[in-house]
Amino acid sequence: MNLRELLTAAAITPGFEHPALNQEVKSLRMNSWECEPGSLFIGMPGTRVEGGNFWPSALAAGAIAAVVSPQAKPREGEACVIVVPDIERACGRLAAAFYNYPSQHLSLLGVTGTNGKTTTTHLVEHLLNRVGYPTALLGTLYSRWPGHCEVASHTTPFAVTLQEQLAAAVDAGCRFGVMEVSSHALAQDRVWGCQFEVAAFTNLTQDHLDYHRDLEDYFAAKAKLFTADYLKGRAILNGDDPFGQRLAQQLPRDRYWTYGLSKDADFRAENLNYRSNGVTGAVHTPLGSGTLDSPLVGQFNVANVLAAIAMGAAVGLPLEAMLNALRDFPGVPGRMEQVRLDPEQDITVVVDYAHTPDSLENLLRAARPFIPGKLICVFGCGGDRDRSKRPQMGAIAARLADQVVVTSDNPRTENPQRILDDILAGIPPETAMIVEGDRRQAILQAILTAAPGDGVIIAGKGHEDYQILGTEKVHFDDREEARNALKERLKQPLQRG
């Protein structure tokens, strides 16, 4: 495809003639240093710099042309630099056209919401694969499909990477694609050019208010996924969530299903029996009723399971097949993940990604019934992010845990002590508490001092295998640290309790 054809497909008019318009486009690049002969450079605005300003470097590296926003202010007529007013959406259109509209060649299912995206998408992938449909999964942990798996750098990739990955999944024979859709991605139009067969909304609670103006702005970003620009099929909405209820009011009744524990939900569960290794109960759906036997712990995971079943039903999966497949779901790395050295281990250690007030509360409430002794919560909050949630999380940990260990998460460029102070502002002074800014030492201390029967819940980082200190990313894995601490505990039995 030459540049003129690609621009036409993306509804972009260059406004001038140039020999480059007849050249073949061999690749799309959003970074000037990645450009090569035959590239089309798409200069995106950044938080610190205007990416379009790097068009001279892109052309010097061999790019045949550049597409930029008016903020880049290229000199007219000097080179093949095309200015578009809607650079984010133009990027989505260009990427979709260049990769031959992959979302038209597989059924794309998206999940948005503050919490539950990763678990729900993994569940849907598992159900589809078990029924026999090759499926791509794109999300917080990785992008994977048959024969391919790579660690993800963003919950939702930028438009060029996203369309490239979907095209590769189509080439690999995938019938379905399941992806997490973040509020950042929706606000930045990263998924522009994608058409979703099914879109699910899990919940909305406080998070990312360092990026969004307020909760309403955050909700407006999430709600974009359920407009005609993106969704061509059915919406799956959490009927127990007030923002899910608001979305339902914006859609025709025949365009959505609800899920939850309320009796009027289309997909609902009842007679639930929560265990340390999962939950059983009855599930009722428009497809009929069945027995729920899930290996996932906690009420919040019942909601994730119901969302996944509803999404599967929306693309034609039989209820019985989904319930059977659910029984052997392997779980998700860093989500309620138990760390155990041997079956006789005398304390429970759980690592989880909970990093919002709501997810921390759900985690501690889910763990409490299965901890016979004290519940010890180790957590911190990320730096250069929403400060207002820090005292809230401190208050939640103090209310629901028997002992709180406050530590660092990813301080980034913020003063770590200020982050700790923000958290401590929400913790009553009478709380049993340890403050240890070194996360490794905090985990070690919590595990070494736990008594038999206690539970140590390490929250915030989950699957992450790094810590961001300043601008440097260093290796750090809560699960590794927990295992090391458990080994140390075996050497020092007298320190227990």
Swiss-Prot record:
It catalyses: UDP-N-acetyl-alpha-D-muramoyl-L-alanyl-D-glutamate + meso-2,6-diaminopimelate + ATP = UDP-N-acetyl-alpha-D-muramoyl-L-alanyl-gamma-D-glutamyl-meso-2,6-diaminopimelate + ADP + phosphate + H(+). Its EC number is 6.3.2.13. Its cofactor is Mg(2+). The modification N6-carboxylysine is found at residue 222. InterPro entries: Folylpolyglutamate_synth_CS, Mur-like_cat_sf, Mur_ligase_C, Mur_ligase_C_dom_sf, Mur_ligase_cen, Mur_ligase_N, MurE/MurF_N, UDP-N-AcMur-Glu-dNH2Pim_ligase. Pfam families: Mur_ligase, Mur_ligase_C, Mur_ligase_M. Meso-2,6-diaminopimelate binds at residues 385, 409-412, 460, 464. A motif (Meso-diaminopimelate recognition motif) lies at residues 409-412. Keywords: ATP-binding, Cell cycle, Cell division, Cell shape, Cell wall biogenesis/degradation, Cytoplasm, Ligase, Magnesium, Nucleotide-binding, Peptidoglycan synthesis. It comes from the Bacteria. SUPFAM superfamilies: MurD-like peptide ligases, catalytic domain, MurD-like peptide ligases, peptide-binding domain, MurE/MurF N-terminal domain. One of its GO terms (biological process) is cell wall organization. PANTHER family: MUR LIGASE FAMILY MEMBER, UDP-N-ACETYLMURAMOYL-L-ALANYL-D-GLUTAMATE--2,6-DIAMINOPIMELATE LIGASE MURE HOMOLOG, CHLOROPLASTIC. This is UDP-N-acetylmuramoyl-L-alanyl-D-glutamate--2,6-diaminopimelate ligase. The gene is murE.
